[in-house]
Amino acid sequence: MASAASAYAEEPLRVYAAGSLNAAVTTMAASFTSAGGPPVATVFGPSGLLRERIEKGERPGVFASADVEHPQRLAREGRSGPAIVFARNRLCALAAPGVDVTPETLLDRMLEPTIKVGTSTPKADPSGDYAWQLFEKADKLKPGAYATLDAKALKLTGGPTSPQPPPGRSIYAVLIAERKADIFLTYCTNAAQAARETAGARVVAIPEALAVGASYALTVVDPSQPGAERFALFVLSIRGQEILAQQGFTPVGAP
């Protein structure tokens, strides 16, 4: 009879997760396995595109999304269990080196014709959806801002044909360094990583009137995979939440 270890070696738990969760889920997977769980095979990408892959028949054990809607949709379609919020994030602005911008001047700078505003791709990637929510808030402060930002925003990441970064690099760091964008709207966790990689790049907080929060949810797609439900519980455990906090996310238990 094959041992549990050899069975795990033959049948790893497959986890699909949002790209912004790469560092956190990779760390959690290693911790989960070292604590006696099966090895974890991860696939990272835009949440909307991962959800489409599941709808077309792919079966990860667990799907962790950068929003609530994609896992909820799978649950409504009968393709997974319920969606459970496990972390929160926020939208920040990543400023390229030499771009003079503060939280107070952010909206005015983004509206300037010469400033290139980068975003992810709406519907394919929740980060893009959150950017457009910010544009809607901007319109309430400055009528016409939505139309301007909607027209000028450069959808540089999160799409089916979006460029991939070199191994070990943040795509946001690459795009900012190449000046594909002067200001990039992305998750604060992504912006912080990119700023660490790019000399002179800065993370700019988004003012409260424009602030957009992001709730991350997971769902068990295939409970028959070894450790699927255990991994979901591990993400929600004290250790899992500690790892998320270390990567800049707000744990679900935080006030």
Positions of PLM-derived features:
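Periplasmic N-terminal soluble interaction domains immediately after the signal peptide in Gram-negative
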Residues: 81-82
